[in-house]
Amino acid sequence: MTVEWLAEQLKEHNIELTETQKQQFQTYYCLLVEWNEKMNLTSITDEHDVYLKHFYDSIAPSFYFDFNQPISICDVGAGAGFPSIPLKIMFPQLKVTIVDSLNKRIQFLNHLASELQLQDVSFIHDRAETFGKGVYRESYDVVTARAVARLSVLSELCLPLVKKGGQFVALKSSKGEEELEEAKFAISVLGGNVTETHTYELPEDAGERQMFIIDKKRQTPKKYPRKPGTPNKTPLLEK
């Protein structure tokens, strides 16, 4: 009854799961576990844990940010599709692009999107650093990333993709506050401004989460993002 558990949790936030959405989440779980046996998509495979720590965790940002509008989203380093695919299931009008550096994960996502019959999704095999220099630079309403690197690094990978007036939605676990302090210099250099922070608990004491909404106020200087690997090795920090 795990999908029913998810439905109950979302109902507390006035979100109703349709039968189609329930079926999509069940299919998502089955495909995730099946493909995980041949490639490393996630260390979390217990059914309830997937619903709690992947599906619910991916949808939770919608409690604080209005995804129920026709916006374009780019998800950087989404791995097995988190948070953007659960958000797409919940809000079908979203236009979703996922950028991931591992081609095997892109193959999984293509198969998943086909099985879930998702429209307006595209999956691109690229490094965020090179993707942020190309034609998609400053073209997305929202760019999201879920804890793939420290916030100072994530900002350099994500803010160049956000259009002026758009938002970077960063999802972190409990140590986000100290990362935010460290990242403020990079965020400013890259044209961003932190406008909202939200701290919330996952159900069943599964951990604290933090969400930062960063508005793109100015264009990102052309030299960012720097070449692949550099943001991680030498993050933009105040001297």
Curated annotation (Swiss-Prot):
GO MF annotation: an example: rRNA (guanine-N7-)-methyltransferase activity
E.C. number(s) listed in UniProt: 2.1.1.-
Keywords (A to Z) from UniProt: Cytoplasm, Methyltransferase, rRNA processing, S-adenosyl-L-methionine, Transferase
Pfam families, sorted: GidB
Region (Disordered): 215-239
Residues that coordinate or bind S-adenosyl-L-methionine: G77, F82, A128, E129, R146
Main location: cytoplasm
Cellular-component GO terms for this entry: cytosol
Localization of this protein: Cytoplasm
Protein origin, superkingdom: Bacteria
Gene3D superfamilies: Vaccinia Virus protein VP39
Keyword Endoplasmic reticulum listed: no
Family, similarity comment: Belongs to the methyltransferase superfamily. RNA methyltransferase RsmG family.
NCBIfam families named in the record: rsmG_gidB (TIGR00138)
HAMAP family: 16SrRNA_methyltr_G
Classification via PANTHER family: S-ADENOSYL-L-METHIONINE-DEPENDENT METHYLTRANSFERASES SUPERFAMILY PROTEIN (PTHR31760:SF0)
Function text: Specifically methylates the N7 position of guanine in position 535 of 16S rRNA.
Protein name from the UniProt record: Ribosomal RNA small subunit methyltransferase G
The species this protein was found in: Staphylococcus aureus (strain bovine RF122 / ET3-1)
